[in-house]
Amino acid sequence: MTKKYLKVDVVSPLGSVFKGEADMVSLRGSAGEMGIAYGHTELLSTLPAGVVNVRKDQHTDVLYVSGGIVEVTPTRVTIMVDDMERAENLNQAEAEKARVRAKEVLKNPDASKLDIEAANKRLKEADARLKALNSSNGLYYSKDD
């Protein structure tokens, strides 16, 4: 029996940023963690900033996504994002600095509501980048220090 693969496409406003095949795609949607394989029920979900794992046979592509929407059909996964980076292209020091800067804003009692919202978004993105980096290295990352 021939193995069937999902078609996977990650698109941003700039166009397709990742195309491939997978026997399993794992990600966090609005309802929690999802594992998607060939033949999956159709669904549409929002995505927070996080990690998408695209596995084909013994190889896994680890992707950081800034958040967006995922559309699943039995044969295809399409992820629409504002931004996507492969984990191997992420910079750990930059992500850690962004996390520290965001936490400093959140600790500032004089920060405006707009600054707090922006800092919360940057903190979630930095945490997701660190999780993607550590997932690709086989490490576990906890955002609670």
Swiss-Prot record:
The record describes its membrane topology as:
Peripheral membrane protein
Compartments, as annotated in UniProt:
Cell inner membrane
SUPFAM superfamilies referenced in this protein's UniProt entry, alphabetically: Epsilon subunit of F1F0-ATP synthase N-terminal domain
Superkingdom of source: Bacteria
Question: Which one of the record's GO molecular function terms can you name?
Answer: ATP binding
Key words of the record: ATP synthesis, Cell inner membrane, Cell membrane, CF(1), Hydrogen ion transport, Ion transport, Membrane, Transport
Q: Does the keyword Methyltransferase apply?
A: no
Signal peptide stretch: none
Q: How does it assemble?
A: F-type ATPases have 2 components, CF(1) - the catalytic core - and CF(0) - the membrane proton channel. CF(1) has five subunits: alpha(3), beta(3), gamma(1), delta(1), epsilon(1). CF(0) has three main subunits: a, b and c.
Question: PANTHER family, from UniProt?
Answer: ATP SYNTHASE DELTA/EPSILON CHAIN, ATP SYNTHASE EPSILON CHAIN, CHLOROPLASTIC
Q: What does this protein do?
A: Produces ATP from ADP in the presence of a proton gradient across the membrane.
The protein here is known as ATP synthase epsilon chain
The species this protein belongs to is Francisella tularensis subsp. mediasiatica (strain FSC147)
Q: Which gene encodes it?
A: atpC
